């Protein structure tokens, strides 16, 4: 059996110490990185708290009327002129007093053609279809909206049929045609709505009809990006890790 002398042990110690220090450095570096990397938002169930962080300050306005809000139940209806359509005695009236997270491309439009939807509807898709879960929770497709209008919109597609809308919600310009199942949003929301549809088509392959494409291309040109839309896109990137390329390129061109 080979004996280790005092001199050989002294030579081995620096090597052992160096390896130990190197191991500790690698361990602590990987630990630091794991804490530094925030998990990216990827599902609708956990989207609420993240969206509340995104829509603060100037971005805390609802999609359909531009009403500012502070907290989900504190909507300032004076600047936007919103007035509930429903009778205060009806249960649905409560939704007029709160902010909800609206899918610009509806969950039905994202999922009704998928096998999971046919087998059990939206809930089944949420829990059993990973791609649908990504679509449903994509922050680019979610926007704060007054609950009553969100409910009235239902699964209706966006459209444009009049330049003189007859008010339905006070002086708010968004209107809903329940018979034809379509929604005409206010002018200030149209460009953003168009660019979100382009994003969802590119990101997830949700095809647009010829009619919808023509409408959204027109809206995209008529209603260019604003500083607020560009800021929204940057905030979403912080939490989700990606930007809407149709917004990003337009923001750069506009100098935002």
What are these model-derived regions, one by one?
Residues 83-85, 89-256:
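Domain-level detector of nuclease and nuclease-like folds
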Residues 9, 30, 66-68, 81, ...:
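Secreted/luminal cysteine- and crosslink-motif detector
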Residues 27, 63-65, 78, 114, ...:
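Secreted/extracellular small peptides and ectodomain modules produced from precursors
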Residues 32-36:
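Sec/Tat signal peptide C-region and signal peptidase I cleavage site
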Residues 20-30:
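Bacterial N-terminal signal peptides
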Residues 37-98, 216-218, 228-229, 236:
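Aromatic-lined ligand-binding clefts that engage carbohydrates, nucleic acids, or primary amines
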Residues 1-17:
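N-terminal secretory signal peptides that target proteins for export/translocation
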Residues 13-14, 28-29, 106-107:
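Alpha-helical and His/Cys-centered functional microenvironments
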């Amino acid at each position: 059996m080979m004996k280790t002398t005092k001199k050989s042990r002294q030579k081995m110690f620096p090597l052992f110490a160096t390896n130990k220090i190197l191991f500790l450095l690698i361990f602590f570096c990987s630990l630091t990185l794991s804490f530094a990397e925030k998990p990216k938002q990827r599902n609708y169930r956990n989207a609420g708290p993240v969206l509340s962080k995104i829509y603060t300050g100037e971005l805390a306005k609802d999609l359909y009327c531009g009403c500012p809000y502070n907290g989900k139940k504190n909507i300032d209806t004076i600047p936007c002129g919103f007035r509930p359509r429903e009778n205060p005695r009806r249960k649905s009236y409560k939704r007029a007093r709160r902010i909800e997270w609206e899918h610009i491309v509806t969950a039905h439009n994202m999922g009704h053609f998928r096998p999971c939807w046919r087998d059990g509807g939206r809930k089944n898709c949420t829990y059993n279809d990973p791609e649908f879960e990504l679509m449903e929770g994509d922050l680019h497709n979610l926007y704060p909206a007054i609950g009553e209008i969100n409910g009235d919109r239902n699964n209706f597609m966006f459209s444009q049929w009049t330049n003189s809308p007859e008010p339905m919600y006070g002086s708010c310009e968004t209107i809903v045609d329940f018979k034809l199942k379509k929604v005409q949003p206010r002018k200030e929301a149209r460009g953003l709505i168009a660019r979100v549809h382009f994003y969802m088509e590119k990101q997830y392959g949700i095809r647009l009809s010829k009619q919808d494409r023509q409408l959204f291309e027109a809206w995209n040109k008529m209603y260019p990006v604003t500083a607020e839309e560009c800021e929204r896109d940057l905030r979403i990137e912080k939490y989700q890790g990606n930007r809407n390329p149709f917004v990003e390129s337009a923001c750069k061109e506009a100098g935002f």
